[in-house]
Amino acid sequence: MRNFIAASLIAADFWNLENEFNQLKQTNVEWIHYDIMDGHYVPNITVGSCELDSLINKTSIPIDIHFMVSNPDEIVPIFVDKYKSTTVVNITVHLETCNNIGKLSRLVRKSGIGFGLAVHPLSLIHI
């Protein structure tokens, strides 16, 4: 398994994204990590698909989307359909919020996008 260096968009200057991306091109950053937070699963609210459209148009760096939302089974298919032929290379969802991980994983991977699971540090997992 290969590791990637991903720069989190949440730390970027949103008023100057193009310059931020130009600076990233001079580094070893291989992915841009894009957090989508809904204010329910986590208390913060971040950007959505309109901002992601702008991001895709400003950089060719591959994009990793991390969904911190309470309903990924509903939201992720919309994003997959919209972004399957773009620079989005990976989608990560939280184990605790998925109703059908297998179905969601198959949908994402069938589109050619990688799929990952995140786990809340306090969650108990039985294997």
Name the predicted role of every residue range.
Residues 1-89, 96-98:
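Conserved N-terminal beta1-alpha1 strand-loop-helix module at the mouth
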Residues 10-15, 113-123:
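Active-site glycine- and acidic-residue-rich loops that bind
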Residues 106:
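Catalytic pocket-lining loop regions of alpha/beta-barrel enzymes
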